[in-house]
Each structure stands twice: as structure tokens, then as C-alpha cells.
Amino acid sequence: MSLTMCVMEFGAVRLFFNLFLVVVACGVGTAGAQSYYEPERGTATRSALMDAIRPHVEWDLGQPIEFVVNDLRVSGDVAFASLAPQRPGGTPIDLRDTPWYRRNWDPNSDFMDFMDGTHTEALYRRMRDTWVAVHFAIGATDVWYAWDEFCPEYRSVIPEWCK
């Protein structure tokens, strides 16, 4: 085989290999594409999601509540939120001064040691035109929303937890 033929074959192999890499990269990019979006501040969707969880959090932590949104994801009719409740103006919430604490206080219990403060996660479902906070936890120390019972329905908004 001549040197020219070898160079041409090498060029064809290299071209094929480069095309293969492009196809694989595009396929991986598509397969791993994000399936959710974050509603922008001030949108009706974001407000509706905060309004859906607010009564639950106020029942446990008292009124009034503001949320620092750490993560908010929507995909179709499901959503996920990771929130940090606080009092207006950024005042932290003292768990010992909440309705939840007064309802559950036990001098023989150290349950406060097993909480992650007021950090709140919620899983939502849109029913007709209304967002409903179907599952939520305040102060959870585990990734409860990645349990097998939730993943089939909420995988699109928490794909990193639902493999």
C-alpha cells in the first residue's frame, strides 16, 4: 500500500471517529438534558408554589413566613422545592418559639438534635389549575423525597436522587 493510500485511509478513519464522537456527545447531551425549569421570581407559577406550601409551614413554624428559595423545579404537573423559611426581613426562626415545638415539646426528648433547623423540602402536584404541596418535611436530615415511593412520580424534578 502506498503512503498516499495510508494517509487517505487514516484521514477517513479519523473523520469517521470524529463524527462518531460528535454523535455520541450529542446523544449524551440529549439524554442527560435537564427535564425541569425554575420559575422566575415574580411569576404566577412561583407564587402559586410558595402559596401552596405556606399554610403547612405556618402551621408548624408560625406566621408570618418568607421563603428563601434554594431550589425550585417544575416539570409538567410536578414540582420540587428546597426552601429556607424565615421571618420577614430575614429574621431566623427559633424552633423553640414555634407552634410545632409547643405541640410536641417533651422534656425527656432530644428530638431537636435530630432536625436540620427549619430547612423545608416539598413535592408538589398540579391538580387542574392549582398547585398542591402533596408531601413536605421541615428539618429533615435525610433525603426523604428520594424514597422509592416518590421517584416514579417525581423523577423529572429530582433526577439526581432518583436513578
Describe each model-derived feature in a short phrase.
Residues 1-14:
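N-terminal secretory signal peptides that target proteins for export/translocation
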Residues 16-27:
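Bacterial N-terminal signal peptides
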Residues 29-33:
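Sec/Tat signal peptide C-region and signal peptidase I cleavage site
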Residues 35-64:
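Short, non-transmembrane alpha-helical segments in secretory-pathway proteins
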Residues 64-72, 134-136:
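Surface-exposed patches in mature extracellular/periplasmic domains of secreted proteins
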Residues 70-119, 125-126:
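Mature extracytoplasmic domains of secretory-pathway proteins
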Residues 119-154:
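Short beta-strand edge/turn micro-motifs at domain boundaries
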Residues 155-163:
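Short, low-complexity, Pro/Ser/Thr/Gly-rich segments in the mature regions of secreted, periplasmic
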